[in-house]
Amino acid sequence: HASTRRLVLQGADAVAFIADSQVSETENNAASFLDLRANLKELGRSMRDVPLVIQFNKRDLANTRSDAEIDELARRGKEPVFKASAVHGQGVIESFFGLLDRAWRKLDAEHDLRQKLAIGPDDFLAKAAASLGYEGRARELCEAHVGGRRGQ
């Protein structure tokens, strides 16, 4: 798995770190996050250089971290944190749009996408939201997180 993760990270424009909300998975989440950092470092990349969102999934299960605990973790970090239950479809599209927002803004800063493609980040996100059936909700989707800053 480690070699596959490194290969995927090598060409990644952004990363969604999916953490398990169950308290019993706290150590595994921490180990996976440290592994992500180490893999990026091996590739000559830094956590600061790669747009990142964190999603706490499995919010529907028992014995999960409380919203207050996740909110506190989010306040301590720079990355936006999304709460989700993938099996119920909650928080998934929001996590995606949070990541899409950060990725677009980073790529725009590096490659001047706004000029080359004649579309700014807000219009790009609005079109993406509309194409997925979320007309007029791009900003709401991007901002459905705790912690972090939009587009950073």
For each predicted feature, which ranges?
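Switch II (G3) loop of P-loop NTPases
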Residues: 1-5
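Conserved Switch II/interswitch segment of TRAFAC-class P-loop GTPases
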Residues: 11-34, 41-48, 59-64, 85
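C-terminal-of-GTPase-core extension/linker across diverse P-loop GTPases
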Residues: 88-90, 101-152
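Short, well-ordered alpha-helical segments in soluble proteins
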Residues: 37-40, 44, 103, 107
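Low-complexity, flexible helical/coil segments
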Residues: 26-32, 49-56, 87-93, 115-123
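Canonical P-loop GTPase G-domain recognition
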Residues: 50-53, 60-113
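A short linear boundary/processing microfeature
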Residues: 35, 39-42, 72-76
